[in-house]
């Protein structure tokens, strides 16, 4: 009887599994084939954003599937991707779906599927041009491109609006960047495009940094004009970060600085916001900073009437902070758009509490650094801190998702600090979290893998990326996951040879090899030190000089014998590949990085992990 019950339960379980498998198969079969799609576009979408969206769809689909969707002005064909505004009553004689009715919140969009026996229509409907861009981004992120196929699951149809109006990243074309300064105009546009596909709506640059870089392909003036134009074409906000490094109490210096801004505003083709940090750098009292901001706001309005001026309270004393808020309370200036909170600022919660509601509040979050920074990596082994340093490849989806959700409620969004491509996944995490707090780190990472590598979730590449984050959790000696993650990345390295030319893939593999190399070295070198200490303990028997001689010979074996030369070679290979693919400068000597803290992981790859330098 007992065996019968058990057998019966197994039969029931088996039937359930088969049923679920059938459902799964049918769901997969429900994917819509858009391989023959053409684009039908509403003329009411504002130019030049309309033309940019068309180009984005055509080029990104072509890259992934070898399919170039043509533009059409008719509804003929088996599949149509229709782009329209929610204010349109119809598109080429066909009424928009009822689901296309959107709220008036800027950037809102719908992706709607209409199926008939002879035709499928994918509607990309935005409340504005930027909404249509983000609808296109949703389609690209959630579609599956396999061979010559372009597939979309109807369950990914959506009606969506952003939670935070500011979602951006600083991409300063300057010498201290670990990669941006080596980029071409085409690379900058492609990167901005990819950030927009993930929901970014603003980009910030640094126009007044005159330090030359040996990597720059064009002048900083030309590149900043180009980035400004790219933002205009994509319908994104363009910010500039403009610290004041002169004494504003000196009237002549004050006027010269105002003129510098005025001249720049005239030359800049498109500008949305000007951010002047109160400090870091700069040490002017707000009694001088505020009149300066008012003066440049007047100049800004002449050239860019819709643009706004922002200030941060970075480095301000309590007296200076009180001075600033007293000014806002008594004067309530309309020329000030908002306040930025960054490293060295008062807490975000305090700023939002004291800041009058008419002013916006932006988070200047540091998502690029691991140590000596606003949000240092938690429980990071000292061996990683000594070798990887402050600016390594640092995909940390869980950590940065938590940080975003912790601080976002006190702000109107973020424009994050970044000094290179190494924090690429963190940018995508914040861009998606800024759109919706309901999105989680795993889901965003899976979108990242699908869009950039064309790999579906079945190969668990997202898990391998999350494994790199877990590599940094706690003492190396106790972290058995480092070797497991490395083994998985070696399998992926062999399974996807075509991805070897992709800089994002190269960065992840570099980290997998580097983390494992550091762990093996630490275990080896710490064992040598224990052996050296054992030899020193024999001094009473063999004499102190002999004991010291043997101990030094033992502990310095690490300088003569490399425990993992194959891993070391792979690290060099990936550093070389990344220099050529994305301009990543991992060495001061070899790749002319601006300084050892700027991502120079190759220069510190063999940094001692025992005390041999001090014995």
Region spans (language model):
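Feature activates predominantly on carbohydrate-active enzymes
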Residues: 32, 47-48, 53-56, 60, ...
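Structural motif
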Residues: 41-46, 83-89, 125-127, 173, ...
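Catalytic-core regions of glycoside hydrolase
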Residues: 70, 146-148, 201, 214-228, ...
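Acidic, contiguous N-terminal accessory segments
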Residues: 14, 18-23, 27-115, 152-155
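Composition- and surface-driven signal marking solvent-exposed, interaction-prone regions
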Residues: 12-19, 27, 53-54, 138, ...
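Terminal accessory regions of large proteins
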Residues: 464-479, 485-615
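Bacterial N-terminal signal peptides that target proteins for export
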Residues: 2-16
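Short acidic, S/G/P-rich loop/turn micro-motifs used as interaction or catalytic elements
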Residues: 44-49, 88-91, 176-178, 212, ...
């Amino acid at each position: 009887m007992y065996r019968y019950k058990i057998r019966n339960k197994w039969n029931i379980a088996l039937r359930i599994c088969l049923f679920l498998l059938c459902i799964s198969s049918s769901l997969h079969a429900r994917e819509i084939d858009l391989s023959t799609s053409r684009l039908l576009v509403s003329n009411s979408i504002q130019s030049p954003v309309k033309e940019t969206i068309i180009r984005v769809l055509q080029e990104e689909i072509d890259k992934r599937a070898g399919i170039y969707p043509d533009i059409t002005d008719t509804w003929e064909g088996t599949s149509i991707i229709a782009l329209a505004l929610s204010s349109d009553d119809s598109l080429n004689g066909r009424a928009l779906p009822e689901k296309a009715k959107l709220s008036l919140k800027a950037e809102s969009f719908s992706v709607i599927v209409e199926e008939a026996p002879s035709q499928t229509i994918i509607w990309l409907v935005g409340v504005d041009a930027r909404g249509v861009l983000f609808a296109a981004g949703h389609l690209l992120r959630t579609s599956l491109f396999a061979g010559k196929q372009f597939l979309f699951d109807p369950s990914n149809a959506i009606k969506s609006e952003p939670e935070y109006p500011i979602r951006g990243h600083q991409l300063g074309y300057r010498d201290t960047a670990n990669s941006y300064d080596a980029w071409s105009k085409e690379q900058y546009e492609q990167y901005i495009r990819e950030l927009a596909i993930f929901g970014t709506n603003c980009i910030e640059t640094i126009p007044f940094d005159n330090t030359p870089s040996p990597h720059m392909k064009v002048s900083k003036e030309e590149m900043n004009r180009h980035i400004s134009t790219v933002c205009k074409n994509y319908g994104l906000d363009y910010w500039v970060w403009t610290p004041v490094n002169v004494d504003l109490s000196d009237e002549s210096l004050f006027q010269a600085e105002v003129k510098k801004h005025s001249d720049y505003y005239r030359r800049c083709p498109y500008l949305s916001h000007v951010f002047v940090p109160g400090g870091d750098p700069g040490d002017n009292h707000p009694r001088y900073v505020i009149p300066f901001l008012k003066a440049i706001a007047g100049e800004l309005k002449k050239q860019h009437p819709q643009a706004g001026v922002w200030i941060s309270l970075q480095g301000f004393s309590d007296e200076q902070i009180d001075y600033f808020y007293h000014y806002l309370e008594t004067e309530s200036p309309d020329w000030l758009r908002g306040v930025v909170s960054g490293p060295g600022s008062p807490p975000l919660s305090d700023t939002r509490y004291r800041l009058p509601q008419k002013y916006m509040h932006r988070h200047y979050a540091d998502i690029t650094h691991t140590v000596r920074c606003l949000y240092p990596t938690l429980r990071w082994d000292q061996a990683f801190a000594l070798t990887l340093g402050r600016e390594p490849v640092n995909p940390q989806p869980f950590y940065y998702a938590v940080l975003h959700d912790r601080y976002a409620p006190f702000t109107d969004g973020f424009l994050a600090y970044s000094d290179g491509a190494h924090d690429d996944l963190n940018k995508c995490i914040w861009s998606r979290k800024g759109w919706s707090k309901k999105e989680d780190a795993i889901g965003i990472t899976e979108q990242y893998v699908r869009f950039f590598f064309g790999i579906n979730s079945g190969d668990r590449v997202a898990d391998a990326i999350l494994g790199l984050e877990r590599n940094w959790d706690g003492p190396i000696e106790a972290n058995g996951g480092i070797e497991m993650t490395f083994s998985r990345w070696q399998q992926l390295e062999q399974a996807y040879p075509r991805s070897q030319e992709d800089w994002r893939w190269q960065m992840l593999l570099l980290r997998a090899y580097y983390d494992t190399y550091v762990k093996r070295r630490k275990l080896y070198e710490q064992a040598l030190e224990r052996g050296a200490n054992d030899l020193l303990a024999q001094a009473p028997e063999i004499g102190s000089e002999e004991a010291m001689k043997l101990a030094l010979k033992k502990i310095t074996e690490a300088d003569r014998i490399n425990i993992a030369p194959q891993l070391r070679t792979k690290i060099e290979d990936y550093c070389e590949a990344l220099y050529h693919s994305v301009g990543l400068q991992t060495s001061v000597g070899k790749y002319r990085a601006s300084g050892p803290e700027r991502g120079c992981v190759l220069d510190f790859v063999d940094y001692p992990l025992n005390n041999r330098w001090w014995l």
